[in-house]
Amino acid sequence: SYLTLSASEGSNALTVRWDIALRDLDYVLQLDRDGDAKLTWGEVRQRADDITRYATRHLALASGGAPCPLQATAPLQLDRHSDGTYAALALSARCPQLAQAVTVTYSLLFDVDPSHRGLVQWVAPGGTDAQALVFGTDSAEQSLRLQPPSWAETLRQYIWEGVWHIW
């Protein structure tokens, strides 16, 4: 899945865009109701609430030890990526306060596919460059700093993730 998180200066809200492959959602939620091995917009739309519930049960955000509850901000949409069609969820998380970092706990599909990875882009308040992170079973909880990373930190992270990916 592809998860984009961003925060704005002066706000306690986080903006969340989460694209999840329909093939993965079909595997766990059995979206293909007629069994023809082809998902239609109607089949996906009928299960939009189930998709949102499933996704938000597998993503937790917190800041300063307090949870930041997720809620949908727009109806489910579809988006095409190079490897297929994705459900695109528009969410927001309102935190009681944004402390120095946001703790993200990601567990989507880990119970059925331990090799699943979540690719995350994080844009800190006042930042223009996104920080890239990868969530996996061994890195399911990560801390996102509210200060934008330096160019050196960003480069180090890309090199680390690249080496880990090749390994």
Enumerate the predicted regions with their spans.
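N-terminal soluble domains immediately following signal/targeting peptides that reside
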Residues: 1-164
